[in-house]
Amino acid sequence: MERTLVLIKPDGVKRGLIGKILNHYEEKSLEIVALKLISASKDDAKEHYREHEGREYFQGLINYVTEGKMCAMILMGEKAVDVVRKINGDKDPVKAELASIRGEFTLDKTHNLVHASDSPESAEREIAIWFPELTCKDSYKKTVDLFQKIDGPIINV
């Protein structure tokens, strides 16, 4: 089983498309393992899209994803990364299959409704940005902090 991150961007949230978009994923037997509404900070957005930094559209992209609430989710299933990207469709709505999310709902190339991780490695990096409470490293730190409060300092070997 593989995990992937999906963000329903502010235009999808504002247009009330969360339920319709979720249906597309659930119809393909993808399991929603985490979901939350978020307001992305500029720093989190820049970290998420860091590979685009320096490109002419970068600042516009950051402004777009921080202009309103987003719905962040972790989906799990067989080949989840590839399945989700196929369900989402091409970023250009003219090229997207009509049955895809972007083919059905996207109004223009810039406001393309959804983001999906492009590889299992990207998925884990992106999940750590938007769901830090679910990362092992963070859970370990919380456990260590808890024991330090109870028993005093812990010595790492």
Model-derived segments and spans:
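Non-catalytic terminal and connector segments of soluble metabolic enzymes
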Residues: M1-V157
